[in-house]
Each structure stands twice: as C-alpha cells, then as structure tokens.
C-alpha cells in the first residue's frame, strides 16, 4: 500500500505525455489542398452553319419512247442499258403500208397538179369556169398535204431517240404490234449528266434559320451559299459539288416540309436515279460562336445541359446551358457561357459548386486551329 501514491503519479505522467503528443500531431497535420482541374478558356469563333438533309436523285431529263404510227416491230436497234444519242434510230416498224400510201399520194399529186395547170390555161381562154379552176387548184393543195402526211408517217416508222441518255429495257420485242397513242412506252431514256437531287427541309428548321438571319445571329453565307455537297449511302463524299437550283413555294401538307432541288455534274454516272443521299447545304455564318468541348458539358437529372466554370476567385460555378447542336467534338452554345469563361473539362468528379480549385490547362481537349476551325464541321444534332 505504500507504493500506491507512486503508481498514481506514474500513470498521471504517462497520460499527460500522451495528451501532449496528440496535440503536437494535430498541430502538425497539413491543411486539405484545393483539387486540381483542367480548364479550357472559351473564345468566340467563326463557323459556317451547314444543314444535312435527306433526299433522292432524279434524272435531269426523262423521255418515254412511244410509236407515232401503227405497225409491227421489225427490228430493235439498240442495246438495253446503253448510251444513245438524240436522233439515233431505236426501232424499225414495218414500212410497207406507209410506202404504198406515199406512192399513192405522189401519183395523186401529179394528177391534181396536171389538172390544175391545164385548167389555168383554159380559164384564160374562158373554156372553163373560175369555179372549176378553183376546185382543181384546191385538190392540188390537198394532194400536196396528203403527200407530206404520207412522208411523215413513213419517217415515223423509224423510231428515233428524242434525247441523249441511257436507255432502259425494251418493253416490246420484234414482232410485237404497236399503235399510235398507246399508253405503254416502248422504252425509257434518262439523261444522267447532270442529275437532280431533291431534298426536303422541315418548316421548323426553315423558320428558325430565317429568324436567326433576321436577328443578326447568323449572316448569309455569301456567294457560296448555293453550293451543295453530297454524301452517298456508304458515307463517302461525292467528288462533284452541286448547286442549289430552286426551292418549292409550297409546303407539303403530309410531311410539313419544303422540297429543295440541287443540280450536280455526273460525268461518270456514279449517281443513278432513285439513290438515297444526304445533301450538305450552307445555311449561314456565325461570326462569334461560342463552342464548348463536349468533355465539359454534362446533363442534370432533367436532361438539361450544364457546365462547371472557374470564376475569378478560383471557385467553381454551375452554369445552365442552352446548346443547339454539335459541331464535330464541340457543342454550339447559345446561352450560359461567355468569352473568357474557364470551362472545366478535367477533374469534374472531384469538384462541386463553391469549391476553390487549382487551375491548369486541360490536356484532354485539342486547341482550336483557328477562327475557321468549325467551318467544315457538320451540324449533326437537333436543337435541344
């Protein structure tokens, strides 16, 4: 029992030492560091807004070959699917009946002409009346007209190509009877160079474009506004550039769209009528567009686009955005970001609004090559 005060003093000393040691450790613990984020400084850029519209190709000219006289087809003088020239003979219809009609018309003309000349001499001698001479002269004129008609009918037994182009399959073979005025075409010729591309644009897109042009948000694309590029079904770009020809003046009630027609050179006949394509049209120029990298744009629970930016105090701010479309790897921002804003694209998972951060240049975003970097970008997303 004599050692109890000594033990108590020893325990107190150890506890005091432990307490002092803990205080020193707490004082030595470093303060929490601000998280590191990568940012992109928003700069206005100029770009040409393009619209990619679906459409189909159609022949520049189409001619259905039909007979203009009745008869039996003796020969087909073309190869199906080949190129034919205007005026080239395609079919030969049996000319026998028309040759006989022509010979008869020639003989009739000789007879009426001879009678008219003889009456002309006799009328001077008052051997015939003026009425008889007029009747003879009228018969001569009728005979001349009959001769011309017979010559035309005989010429029509040679069925000629009305236009140059590619001819399709023949609907009639040798030995088939054809007639003037029949509804079925003997063959169809289509001119493929140049070729039309008919595309459709919704009235909503058309109205928005007009409002943007009127408000000054977009400027007209200039002299090249009517130029059109074509994307084929396999995703390749057609090497020839076309030109916008016209726009329909009425809206299709069933689809709510307007038809636009473009004309493309087609020397190699790469484009065939009926092909499905996409046409890229230049709509307008935005000289001060705000483009934000997609890495810096997220969605909230409602699906609305948002972004985190670093303010002048190096603190994180939440911005609500209005993004109209994508341009390559960027979003076109209409509201929510301004020139000079520092948009966070790296370290988003480590920060929240109001937190102070350390800022460095982002490494996950390529710097824009220049003010016209987005000129060739495709507008491939609909308005939010």
From Swiss-Prot:
One of its GO terms (biological process) is response to antibiotic. Residues 115-155 form a coiled coil. Residues 1-22 form the signal peptide. GO terms for molecular function: transmembrane transporter activity. It holds the Pfam family CusB_dom_1. The periplasmic linker protein component of an organic solvent and antibiotic efflux pump; confers resistance to toluene, hexane, p-xylene, ampicillin, penicillin G, erythromycin, novobiocin and tetracycline. This is Multidrug/solvent efflux pump periplasmic linker protein MepA.
């Amino acid at each position: 029992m004599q050692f109890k005060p000594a033990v108590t003093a020893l325990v107190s000393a150890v506890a005091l030492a432990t307490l002092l040691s803990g205080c020193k450790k707490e004082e030595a613990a470093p303060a929490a560091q601000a998280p590191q984020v990568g940012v992109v400084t928003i700069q206005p850029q100029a770009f040409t807004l393009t619209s990619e519209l679906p459409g189909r190709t159609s022949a520049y000219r189409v001619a259905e070959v039909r007979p203009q006289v009745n008869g039996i087809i003796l020969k087909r003088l073309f190869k199906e699917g080949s190129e034919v020239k205007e005026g080239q003979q395609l079919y030969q219809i049996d000319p026998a009946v028309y040759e006989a009609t022509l010979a008869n018309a020639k003989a009739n003309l000789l007879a009426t002409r001879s009678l008219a000349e003889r009456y002309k001499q006799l009328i001077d001698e008052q051997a015939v009346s003026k009425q008889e001479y007029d009747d003879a002269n009228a018969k001569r004129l009728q005979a001349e007209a009959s001769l011309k008609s017979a010559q035309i009918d005989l010429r029509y037994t040679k069925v000629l190509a009305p236009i140059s182009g590619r001819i399709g399959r023949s609907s009639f073979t040798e030995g088939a009877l054809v007639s003037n005025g029949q509804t079925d075409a003997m063959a169809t010729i289509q001119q493929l160079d140049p070729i039309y591309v008919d595309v459709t644009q919704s009235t909503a897109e058309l109205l928005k474009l007009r409002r943007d042009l009127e408000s000054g948000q977009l400027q007209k694309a200039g002299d090249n506004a009517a130029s059109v590029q074509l994307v084929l079904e396999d995703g390749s770009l057609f090497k020839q550039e076309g030109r916008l020809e016209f726009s329909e003046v009425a809206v299709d009630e069933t689809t709510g769209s307007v038809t636009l027609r473009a004309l493309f050179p087609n020397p190699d006949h790469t484009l065939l009528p009926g092909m499905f394509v996409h046409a890229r049209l230049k709509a307008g120029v935005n000289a001060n567009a705000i483009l934000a990298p997609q890495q810096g744009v997220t969605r909230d629970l409602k699906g609305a686009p948002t972004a985190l930016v670093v303010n002048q105090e190096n603190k994180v701010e939440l911005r609500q955005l209005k993004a109209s479309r994508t341009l390559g790897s960027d979003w076109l921002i209409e509201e929510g970001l301004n020139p000079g804003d520092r948009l966070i694209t790296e370290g988003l998972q480590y920060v929240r609004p109001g937190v102070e951060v350390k800022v460095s240049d982002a490494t996950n975003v390529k710097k824009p090559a220049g003010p016209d970097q987005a000129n060739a970008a495709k507008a491939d997303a609909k308005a939010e």
